[in-house]
Amino acid sequence: MLKSLFPNVDWDIVEFVGFDMDGTLYDEFNFIIQVYRPIAKRIALSTKSTEQEIYNQLLLRWMEKGSSYNKIFDEILIRHNVVESERETTINECLRIFRKHTPMLTLSDRVSFFLNYVQNKYGLFLITDGGVQLQKAKFHSLGLSSWFEEQNVGFTGLYGSEYSKPSPLITKNIKILEEVFNPKQVVFFGDREVDKKFAEVLGFQFVQTYCLQKEG
């Protein structure tokens, strides 16, 4: 199955499989539509627009730019002529809402099946960037502890920005990677260019995929 789905990987030598989380194991839009609702409500208080109008604008901009883009809230406020001092206050409150949000997420049947399959064949690990409180909440909401042991999960936000991908530093905190003697034994799945660069730095094989869709 794996050779058919991801033919660019040399599966004959793979012993360890790693994953990014957001966008790789689940559709991140499912999180965004949740967290942007209270954020839209807060931004609407600073504008003359309705909560629904702001909500739609936020979602459309996220679809255009993605989560790596950090100017979405600022752009919406500027579009609505909110003065700089109020923009700063509003953005800080929006970021607080974002970071403290309790997500309600589920894995697709496809991803659950895939994880069950590879769990029986390889050692698994996960590495995710972002604020540690929120990333842990996503991890638990998705039920990922069924496949990833705590010692093989790297929350880079726990250690500081210098540990974020593409930095290889976080791998020192992944227990199972102590067993690797050839980096080509490892394949890493991710959805972003930063995941690809991370794998390249370490010499890992890499699959760029969204929600574990087939290559090509």
Predicted regions and their residues:
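Alpha-helical tetratricopeptide repeat
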Residues: 87, 139, 190-193
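Substrate-recognition element of Asp-dependent hydrolases with the DxDx(T/V) motif
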Residues: 89-106, 111-142, 153-156
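A metal-dependent, Asp-based hydrolase signature
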Residues: 49, 59-97
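Active-site neighborhood of HAD-like aspartate-dependent phosphohydrolases
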Residues: 2-54
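Glycine-rich phosphate-binding loop signature in dinucleotide/nucleotide-binding domains
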Residues: 9-12, 120-122, 177-185
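Acidic, Mg2+-coordinating phosphoryl-transfer loop and its flanking beta/alpha structural elements
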Residues: 183-216
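Substrate-recognition "cap/lid" segment bordering the active-site pocket of phosphatases
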Residues: 131-187, 197
